[in-house]
């Protein structure tokens, strides 16, 4: 049992270390291209609809979060006949972003420990 646990920990450590190295290689190779994409994204961000604001005028205008684009969700308030639409982030995408952030932080700690 101890061997299986030790092997599992070693496997997870090696996987996170190798994925951190691949991310570093990706960052160095495409730095110029990434900067141009960020500039375009900043220019486009001025036109998007922020989270929890009305998006009924353009249902595809919601802003992006760190990884995913927000979704225009429409509903009828209780006792009302008018449809209300707001930009919202689905819960499953919110949890995926949190998990990706924690994985990035953990990969950085592993890299710091092993040089």
From Swiss-Prot:
It comes from the Eukaryota. Its main location: secreted. Disulfide bonds join 48-63, 55-72, 62-87, 74-85. GO terms for cellular component: extracellular region. Expressed by the venom gland. It is found in: Secreted. Residues 21-44 form a propeptide. Keywords: Disulfide bond, Knottin, Secreted, Signal, Toxin. The presence of a 'disulfide through disulfide knot' structurally defines this protein as a knottin. Belongs to the neurotoxin 19 (CSTX) family. 01 subfamily. This is U3-lycotoxin-Ls1c.
């Amino acid at each position: 049992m101890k061997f299986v646990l030790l092997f599992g920990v070693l496997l997870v450590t090696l996987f996170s270390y190798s994925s951190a190295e691949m991310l570093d290689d990706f960052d160095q190779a495409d730095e110029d291209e990434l900067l141009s994409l960020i500039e375009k994204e900043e220019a486009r961000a001025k036109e998007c609809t922020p989270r929890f604001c009305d998006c009924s005028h353009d249902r595809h205008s919601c802003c992006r979060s760190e990884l995913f684009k927000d979704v225009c969700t429409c509903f009828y308030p209780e006792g009302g006949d008018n449809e209300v639409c707001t930009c919202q982030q689905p819960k499953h995408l919110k949890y995926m972003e949190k998990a990706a952030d924690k994985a990035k932080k953990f990969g950085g700690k592993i890299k710091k420990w092993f040089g």
